[in-house]
C-alpha cells in the first residue's frame, strides 16, 4: 500500500486523535540536534535518530578495559520543576546522578542515553531538559548518543514528565576503585555539594509546601527558595579522574539516598570503619533551613541528606595534603573531614562526631 503524506483528506482516526503527536516528536529532534552535537566524542559512530547508537571503544587507551554502567533518575525533585516552570537544570541532575556513580569506581564516562516520558509532549519543554542533559554530559566529558521520548496520553498528569538516564564508562581492570585497599589511618577528604543534589525531595516538598511551609517563592538570600532547591547536582567526574592519575585513591563515596549511614559502608572492607568530624565542614544554609522547618534530628539529617558533602575521597594519609591542593586547584571545595579506623564486629561502621 502506498504511503500518502497528504493529511488533508480525513479517512478515519489518527494517532494524533489518540493524543500522540509524531510531528511534535520530529520537531523536538530538530530542536536538540545542536545540543547533542556539542557533546560529541570521536568514538561516536552514529547520528541522532538511528535505531541504535554506535560507540567505537578505543581499546588502545586501555590495557584490560572493563565497562561500567549506571542508571538513575531525578526523583521528586522534578515536582519543583513543574511547579516553578524551570526545566533547565533537571537534565544536569539526571546526568550527574549516573556519572558520579561511574567515577567512584574509577571509570571515565563514555556515553549517556536518556528516557523522557510524558502525557503530552511539549517540544519546547523537552528541548530545555535535553539542553540541560547536554550541559551535564559536557561537564562529565561523555557523549549524549541517544534517547527515547515517550508520549503516553492519560498516563502522566498534564504538564508533568519523568526522566531516566543511563551511562556507560570504562576503566582498566587494575585501576578499578572498589575499596579493597582502604586501611586504618587513611584520610577522608570531603568535596562540597551544591545543595541537596537529587535526594530527599519528598521530605523537602513536605517541609516547604506543607501547610506551615514558606513556599517556593519565599526569599532565600535574595533568590526564590524554589530556584535554590533546583540547583543542579554537582558533577565531580573530571577532577577525580585527574586525581586518580596522580594519587592512590583507595575509595570514593557518592553521598546519595541513605546519606552517610548507608553509603559509606558500601565501600569499607571488613574490620574498618569511618570517623568523620562534623566541625570539619560547614553545612550550607539551605540544610539549616530544612532542619529547622521540620525540627529534624541530626541523625535523620545525616541519613536523608548529604549535609554539604556530595563526595568522599579516601587516600593514604601521606597523600592527603597534595590531594587537597590538587582538588582545590581544580575548583573543588575540599576539606579533610575524617579518617579510616579499625572496627570490630558489632561496632558502628560510621561514627560522626
Curated annotation (Swiss-Prot):
Alphabetical keyword list: ATP-binding, Cytoplasm, Ligase, Nucleotide-binding, Purine biosynthesis
Catalysed conversion reaction: 2-formamido-N(1)-(5-O-phospho-beta-D-ribosyl)acetamidine + ATP = 5-amino-1-(5-phospho-beta-D-ribosyl)imidazole + ADP + phosphate + H(+)
Superkingdom is: Bacteria
EC class: ligase
- Where would you find this protein in the cell? Cytoplasm
Q: What cellular component GO annotations does this protein have? A: cytosol
Q: What is its main location?
A: cytoplasm
Q: List the InterPro entries hit by this protein, alphabetically.
A: PurM-like_C_dom (IPR010918), PurM-like_C_sf (IPR036676), PurM-like_N (IPR016188), PurM-like_N_sf (IPR036921), PurM_cligase (IPR004733)
Which molecular function terms from Gene Ontology are attached?
A: ATP binding; phosphoribosylamine-glycine ligase activity; phosphoribosylformylglycinamidine cyclo-ligase activity
Can you name this protein? Answer: Phosphoribosylformylglycinamidine cyclo-ligase
Q: What species is given as this protein's source?
A: Magnetococcus marinus (strain ATCC BAA-1437 / JCM 17883 / MC-1)
As recorded in Swiss-Prot or TrEMBL, the protein's gene is named purM
Amino acid at each position: 500500500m502506498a504511503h500518502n503524506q497528504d493529511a488533508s483528506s480525513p479517512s478515519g482516526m489518527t494517532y494524533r486523535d489518540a493524543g500522540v503527536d509524531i510531528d511534535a516528536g520530529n520537531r523536538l529532534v530538530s530542536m536538540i540536534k545542536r545540543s547533542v552535537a556539542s557533546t560529541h566524542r570521536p568514538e561516536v559512530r552514529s547520528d541522532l535518530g538511528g535505531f541504535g547508537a554506535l560507540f567505537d571503544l578505543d581499546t588502545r587507551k586501555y590495557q584490560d578495559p572493563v565497562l561500567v554502567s549506571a542508571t538513575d533518575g531525578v526523583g521528586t525533585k522534578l515536582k519543583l520543576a513543574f511547579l516553578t516552570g524551570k526545566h533547565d537544570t533537571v537534565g544536569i541532575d539526571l546526568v550527574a546522578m549516573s556519572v558520579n556513580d561511574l567515577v567512584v569506581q574509577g571509570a571515565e564516562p563514555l556515553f549517556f542515553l536518556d528516557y523522557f516520558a510524558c502525557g503530552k509532549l511539549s517540544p519546547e519543554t523537552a528541548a530545555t531538559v535535553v539542553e540541560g542533559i547536554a550541559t551535564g554530559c559536557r561537564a562529565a566529558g561523555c557523549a549524549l548518543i541517544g534517547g527515547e521520548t515517550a508520549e503516553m496520553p492519560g498516563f502522566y498528569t498534564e504538564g508533568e514528565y519523568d526522566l531516566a538516564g543511563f551511562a556507560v564508562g570504562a576503566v582498566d581492570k587494575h585501576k578499578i576503585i572498589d575499596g579493597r585497599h582502604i586501611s586504618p589511618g587513611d584520610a577522608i577528604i570531603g568535596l562540597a555539594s551544591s545543595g541537596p543534589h537529587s535526594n530527599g525531595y519528598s521530605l523537602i516538598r513536605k517541609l516547604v509546601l506543607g501547610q506551615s511551609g514558606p513556599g517556593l517563592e519565599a526569599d532565600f538570600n535574595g533568590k526564590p527558595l524554589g530556584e535554590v532547591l533546583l540547583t543542579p547536582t554537582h558533577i565531580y567526574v573530571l577532577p577525580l579522574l585527574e586525581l586518580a592519575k596522580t594519587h592512590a585513591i583507595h575509595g570514593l563515596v557518592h553521598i546519595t539516598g541513605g546519606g552517610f549511614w548507608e553509603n559509606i559502608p558500601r565501600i569499607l572492607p571488613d574490620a574498618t570503619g569511618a570517623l568523620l568530624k562534623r566541625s570539619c565542614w560547614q553545612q550550607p544554609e539551605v540544610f539549616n533551613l530544612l532542619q529547622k522547618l521540620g525540627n529534624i534530628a541530626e541523625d535523620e539529617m545525616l541519613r536523608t541528606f548529604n549535609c554539604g558533602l556530595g563526595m568522599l575521597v579516601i587516600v593514604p594519609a601521606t597523600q592527603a595534603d597534595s590531594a587537597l591542593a590538587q582538588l582545590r586547584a581544580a575548583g573543588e571545595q575540599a576539606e579533610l573531614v575524617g579518617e579510616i579506623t579499625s572496627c570490630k564486629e558489632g561496632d558502628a561502621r560510621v561514627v560522626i562526631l
